[in-house]
């Protein structure tokens, strides 16, 4: 994805960047800059900003002096945390337990992103949600399904990494079945906990997400694209995504209950 900064809504900017699989295929990544109600800013996830994008960020944040926090929501998005902290050292650094484990020398805030205390700190600006029926980090670290989803209340913009997929890319990714529609990440079957009730926990979480975030206006998905939403379209899209993973959930119930 091109390294650009795009204003998606009032107070919400999406920064896209490159992540190459095998050094060849660019699947893209994202970070978001969000203005708080008090006029200050936070980052959602980290990225090493190219000079033109950093100039835009610094113009908005007064060279970073108005940047309160860097909130790293996906446990496997760790490549750019050190650069982000070194560039904006006065911003409080938040991460998941895996961020703390993999980058122990960074000055992480004690509150971890998977803890309810994060909403206590930023709940006026964001709603947060984590998929149920699975761990945030699976034993198989090739499975990147789960993450902390964030909804910017003012703009209705959802920042999500991996859990929800919306592809709008050229070949060869255009050949994938999830292209052009909002879907759950294809590793759901590997992400579900091997225990009774996990499939139902996930289904109930997804239904609740669709209801609670029904007024979302767009989904900004890492590696992928932005899906603009019609009025209360999100519950319908979540219902469709659930329908497509019904065989996965049924197989899990048959094996574990």
Predicted features by range, described:
Residues 1-6, 48-63:
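A glycine-rich beta-to-alpha transition motif near the start of alpha/beta enzyme domains, typified by
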